[in-house]
Amino acid sequence: MTEMPKKKFSPRSARGDKPRYGEQKPKLKRSGDKPRFNDDQPQGFKEKSDRFQDKPRPRTNDDKPRRAGDKPSNFKSRFKDKDRDKPRYGDDRPRRSGQKPPFGKTFPAAPPPMDSEQAQEALDLLYGHHAVLAALDGDRQLNRIWITSHLRHDIRYRTKIQTAKANGTVVDEVDNFRLNQITHNANHQGIAAQVAPYHYWELGDLIDKAKSQSTAPVLIIIDSITDPHNLGAIIRTAEAFGAQGMVLPQRRVAGITSTVMKVAAGALEHFPVARVVNLSRALETLKESGFWIYGTVAGKQTALHQADLREPMGLVIGSEGEGLSLLTQKHCDHLITIPLAGKTPSLNASVAAAISLYEIFRQRGFDRPTLSHTASDLREVSED
C-alpha cells in the first residue's frame, strides 16, 4: 500500500490568524487603481499643512487712501487726531437742577444744607407762639412775619399783626409748606418772624435800671458758656425768678442769637442784657457800684445754702467743662458750691444757675413758688 505524504503545518501565530481591529491585510493593486491619500507616508505621521505657517500679513486698510464716508478700521485710530481736552459745544451752558455732569468732568460740591439752628442764625428767625408773641409785645423791631391764614385772624394775633404792619413790618400769609422751608422743618406752630439784631445794653444803664427796680438787685454774669441752649435756659430761669439782668463778655461766650431767643421763650423782651469787652473790668465796676460778686465753682467751698445771699449781688456762672477761669475767680468776693451726694461730679450750667437762683430768692422772702393751680383744681382734674 502506498503511503500518503504527510501534511506539513506551519506554526500558528500567538495572536491568531484574524487581524486586529483597525489592521487590514494589504490589498492587491488592480490595474487602474489610484494610490490612496498618504499611502506613501508611514503610519501615524501627518504632514503639517502649510496654511498654518506664518505668512506675511497684508497691509492694513489704514495705509490705503480713504474715501469720503469711510470709518476707521480700529478703536485706536478713531481718537488719533482728536483733542479730548477741547471743550465741546454746549459745555459752558448752565445745567438744570438734578442733571448729572458729563463723564470725566468734576464740579465743585454743593454746600451742605443748613440745619435749623444755622438757618435761624442766618436770618435772626423766631418761630412758635411764645417767641413771636413776646416779640410782638416787646420793643424790638420785626422786619417780616410769616403767618398761616387761620392764625392771622386768631384773636391772639389779629390786633398785634395790624399794629406791627402799621409800624412797617412786612406780613406774608403763607401755608405750612412755605413755613417748613423757612424754618427747615422746625416746630413753627404756624408763625415765624424775622427780627432785627438784638440791641445790647450798656453796663452803666443796666446797673441803674437794676437799682431802680430793687434794693437788693441780682445780676447774672456769664463766663465761658458757648452753648446757646444753655444761655437761653439761664435767661428764662433768671427772668422767671425775678433777676434784674445779665452781663455777657464779647469773647468766648454765646451771643444773643435767634436760638437763644427761642429757648428763652420770650423772656428776653423783659430781661436786659449788657455786653462788655473786658469781664474783669466789668466785675470791678459792679463792685464799685455796691454789688457783691459770688462765683459758682465745684469743690470744697462754702455751700450754697450756708452763704448769705440777701445783699445786692452778681452771680457768676461758668461752663460745665471749664468752669470759671482763674482770673474771674480772683475777682470774685466769694466762691460758693452746690453740695452733691452722688457720683456725678458737676451739673449742667443752666441747672446750676436754676438751683442757685432758687436759693437766692428763697432767702429773700419766699419759701416756695406760687402754683398756678390749687389743690382743689388738681383734684377736679383727676376726678374727670
Swiss-Prot record:
Composition bias type Basic and acidic residues, residue spans: 14-70, 78-95
Looking at the keywords, is Methyltransferase present? yes
One Gene Ontology BP term is: methylation
Q: Does the keyword Zinc apply?
A: no
Which molecular function GO terms apply here? RNA binding; RNA methyltransferase activity
CDD domains (alphabetical): SpoU-like_RlmB
Q: Where is this region: Disordered?
A: 1-116
Arranged from A to Z, the UniProt key words for this protein are:
Methyltransferase, Transferase
Q: Which Pfam families match?
A: SpoU_methylase, SpoU_sub_bind
Q: Which GO terms describe its cellular component?
A: cytosol
Q: Where does S-adenosyl-L-methionine bind?
A: 318, 338, 347
EC numbers, comma separated? 2.1.1.-
UniProt lists the family membership as follows: Belongs to the class IV-like SAM-binding methyltransferase superfamily. RNA methyltransferase TrmH family.
Q: Which PANTHER family match?
A: 23S RRNA (GUANOSINE-2'-O-)-METHYLTRANSFERASE RLMB
Its name, as the record gives it, is Uncharacterized tRNA/rRNA methyltransferase slr0955
Q: From which organism does this entry originate? A: Synechocystis sp. (strain ATCC 27184 / PCC 6803 / Kazusa)
Phylogenetic lineage: Bacteria, Bacillati, Cyanobacteriota, Cyanophyceae, Synechococcales
